[in-house]
């Protein structure tokens, strides 16, 4: 493919309007733009990303009358996904029709849509455009959804309600247990299985792109390739392949100055993502556990993440006094810069896939406290497969928090985990270099266009 030809070819991206989905999609856009493609991003709302100078070369379209990220918080994931796909199909067709008219009908190489934006398929089929599904989760989570989409809902529900079943390994998904399966994100199990049957149905898509790497998930990727019968391109981690600042929240960079004053590998960084909610009791147990550990910490407390509180007003004055010299709390942090900072020795995370691969990519071991969905899958793999994480299960108490932080930052076991994390980081770096598996996979995808 000659450079001139590629420069005239456009790829359309359709992300879910949520931080964990927008970020990797914009990184994918950067990677494809670096290969010479023009990029159009179709958003359900105008936001900080569309106005960012980092994407000044991108073209942005907005689907009229759609849903926003605030609707996701108000409706919940299940109703949000179903409603989004119901109301966006017709208006998205209009967007694509308008774009084709502007581009003389022959400019669009393909439409890459987030697996949860499956309404996109109807439009690309009508206009006979190639389509590509983009999965923002791990390959293992995709496999899980595929398996769950085929189970008998009634018998599966009986198994999931049996306490004795929870710790058993689910057949064919070792080492995942029943309680690790991504079943809770979309409310009732029946609703979850319905959504999963839509997301794993690649319909007439010509390929699937996964934000992962062969060195992380070779067996799951091979299983997907066999099952889907279309090319699967693991081209991640995209935050390394093509860094693209795309935070929907304002970052407080003062925390970097604070980190500059801390000792190497001494700080535990805590961030539970852009959507997770935590009750006041758990927040207080975390706070006192962090205080009692006597270790420095950088804690992201997102406004509105504690129901009934605007921000940190539920933290006792005594706690604030005790940790004033070694604790730093912000509303949102520049996570990649924090994770690569030499002062950071561990990451307490909800284990969303973006946070997981970002931590792996910087060689930072993790404390895993998943809330829902694929976070539980990732946490299990961090602890049992990659062995660079320790999972906190059950009720949270300050003693458990204190032990986990000390174990990761002070004890010999934590040092061994850090060595394994650095080894995995080196494998990741090799995969994204020229000739590496992820780099080659991206080239293969580009050549297929």
Swiss-Prot record:
It is an enzyme of class 2 (transferase). GO terms for molecular function: quercetin 3-O-glucosyltransferase activity; quercetin 7-O-glucosyltransferase activity. UDP-alpha-D-glucose binds at residues 274, 333-335, 350-358, 372-375. Keywords: Glycosyltransferase, Transferase. It comes from the Eukaryota. InterPro entries: UDP_glucos_trans (IPR002213). Its EC number is 2.4.1.-. SUPFAM superfamilies: UDP-Glycosyltransferase/glycogen phosphorylase. Possesses low quercetin 3-O-glucosyltransferase and 7-O-glucosyltransferase activities in vitro. Belongs to the UDP-glycosyltransferase family. This is UDP-glycosyltransferase 76E2. It comes from Arabidopsis thaliana.
């Amino acid at each position: 493919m000659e450079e001139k030809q590629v420069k005239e070819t456009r790829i359309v991206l359709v992300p879910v309007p949520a931080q964990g989905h927008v970020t990797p999609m914009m990184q994918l856009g950067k990677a494809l733009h670096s290969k010479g493609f023009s990029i159009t991003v179709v958003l359900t709302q105008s936001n900080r990303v569309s106005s960012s100078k980092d994407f000044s070369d991108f073209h942005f379209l907005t689907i009229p009358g759609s849903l926003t990220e605030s609707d996701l918080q108000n409706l919940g994931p299940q109703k949000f996904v179903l409603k989004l796909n119901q109301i966006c199909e017709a208006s998205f067709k209009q967007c694509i029709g308008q774009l084709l008219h502007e581009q003389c009908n022959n400019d669009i190489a393909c439409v890459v849509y987030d697996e949860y934006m499956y309404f996109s398929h109807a439009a690309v089929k009508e206009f006979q455009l190639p389509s590509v599904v983009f999965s923002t989760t791990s390959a293992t989570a995709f496999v899980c959804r595929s398996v769950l989409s085929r189970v008998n809902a009634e018998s599966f529900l009986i198994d999931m309600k049996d306490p004795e079943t929870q710790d058993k390994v689910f057949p064919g998904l070792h080492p995942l247990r029943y309680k690790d399966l991504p079943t809770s994100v979309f409310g009732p199990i029946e609703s979850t299985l319905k959504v999963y049957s839509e997301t794993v149905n690649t319909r007439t898509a010509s390929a699937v792109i996964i934000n992962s790497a062969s060195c992380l998930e070779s067996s799951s990727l091979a299983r997907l390739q066999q099952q889907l019968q279309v090319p699967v391109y693991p081209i991640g981690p995209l935050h390394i392949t093509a860094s693209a600042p795309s935070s929907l929240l304002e970052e407080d960079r003062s925390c970097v100055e604070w980190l500059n004053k801390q000792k190497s590998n001494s700080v535990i960084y805590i961030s539970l993502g852009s959507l997770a909610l935590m009750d006041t009791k758990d927040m207080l147990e975390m706070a006192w556990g962090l205080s009692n550990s006597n270790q420095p910490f950088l804690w992201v407390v997102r406004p509105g993440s504690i129901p009934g509180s605007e921000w940190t007003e539920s933290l006792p004055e005594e706690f604030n006094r005790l940790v004033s010299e070694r604790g730093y709390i912000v509303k949102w942090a520049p996570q990649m810069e924090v994770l690569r900072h030499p002062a950071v020795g561990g990451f307490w995370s909800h284990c969303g896939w973006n946070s997981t691969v970002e931590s792996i990519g910087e060689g930072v071991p993790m404390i895993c406290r998943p809330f829902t969905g694929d976070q539980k899958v990732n946490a299990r793999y961090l602890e049992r497969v990659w062995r660079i994480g320790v999972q906190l299960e059950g009720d949270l108490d300050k003693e458990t928090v204190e032990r986990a932080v000390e174990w990761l930052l002070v004890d010999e076991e934590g040092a061994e985990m850090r060595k394994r994390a650095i080894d995995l980081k080196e494998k990741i770096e090799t995969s994204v270099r020229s000739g590496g598996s992820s780099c080659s996979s991206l080239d293969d995808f580009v050549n297929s266009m």
